[in-house]
Structures are given as structure tokens and as C-alpha cells.
UniProtKB/Swiss-Prot annotation:
This is Holo-[acyl-carrier-protein] synthase. Belongs to the P-Pant transferase superfamily. AcpS family. Gene3D superfamilies: 4'-phosphopantetheinyl transferase domain. One of its GO terms (molecular function) is magnesium ion binding. Keywords: Cytoplasm, Fatty acid biosynthesis, Fatty acid metabolism, Lipid biosynthesis, Lipid metabolism, Magnesium, Metal-binding, Transferase.
Length: 122
């Protein structure tokens, strides 16, 4: 498999905490799928998980070379957890339009930051 693009993102967890405190469900429903919200809200402190998924979506959009809005919307990029780490689900038309077969994603967070790196493969 050939690497097409790489995307990375980092965000302060406090920014996500403030945004959710200010905009609540309106923000959550605009950015995160139901499954993503359910996963994060099961955590004692869901904010780091939301921040990680936000960074993941940004990294994927960068790896696609499109950003958010032109080819993919926030909720078109679904980040979910499997036994070996995060996986990405995109609408089928995105794979064909961009010319990729898979996106690999890594997410990490500490007390202050969440970061993600995505690799789009041909």
C-alpha cells in the first residue's frame, strides 16, 4: 500500500471542554456521531475522549487533503475503537473520489492535549 497523504492535529482539551460547556448538545450533535457520543459519554470524564476524536477527525480530513466541508463533513468521519486502537469509517464515495483504500489513525491524549495522526493509503 502506498501512502497518499498524512495528516496530524493537536488540540487543547480545555478548548473542547469550554466549547461543550458553552454549546452543549448542539455542538456534540454537529460534530460527533451517535456512536461516538455514546462511547465518550460512558467515560468518567468524557472530554478527553471527545478531544481525541475531534483531533482524529481533523487529522483524517488533512490526510484526505480536503479539510472539513468540501468532500467530508464532521459526521462523515466516524472514529470508533476496536481491540487494537481507533478505526475510521468514511462514506464509500470518499474512498473512490480521493483514490484511497484505507485510513490508519492513531490518537493519544494527556492531561492537557489530545493529538492524532492519520495516514491515507492507496
Amino acid at each position: 500500500m502506498e501512502i497518499i497523504h498524512i495528516g496530524t492535529d493537536i488540540i487543547e482539551i480545555s478548548r473542547i471542554r469550554e466549547a461543550i460547556a458553552t454549546h452543549g448538545n448542539r455542538l456534540l450533535n454537529r460534530i460527533f456521531t451517535e456512536a461516538e457520543q455514546k462511547y465518550c459519554l460512558e467515560k468518567t470524564d468524557p472530554i478527553p475522549s471527545f478531544a481525541g476524536r475531534f483531533a482524529g477527525k481533523e487529522a483524517v480530513a488533512k490526510a484526505l487533503g480536503t479539510g472539513i466541508g468540501s468532500v467530508v463533513a464532521w459526521k462523515d468521519i466516524e472514529v470508533f475503537k476496536v481491540s487494537h486502537g481507533p478505526e475510521v469509517l468514511l462514506p464509500s464515495h470518499v474512498y473512490a473520489k480521493i483514490g484511497i483504500s484505507k485510513v490508519i489513525l492513531s490518537i493519544s491524549h494527556c492531561k492537557e492535549y489530545a493529538t492524532a495522526t492519520a495516514i491515507a493509503l492507496a
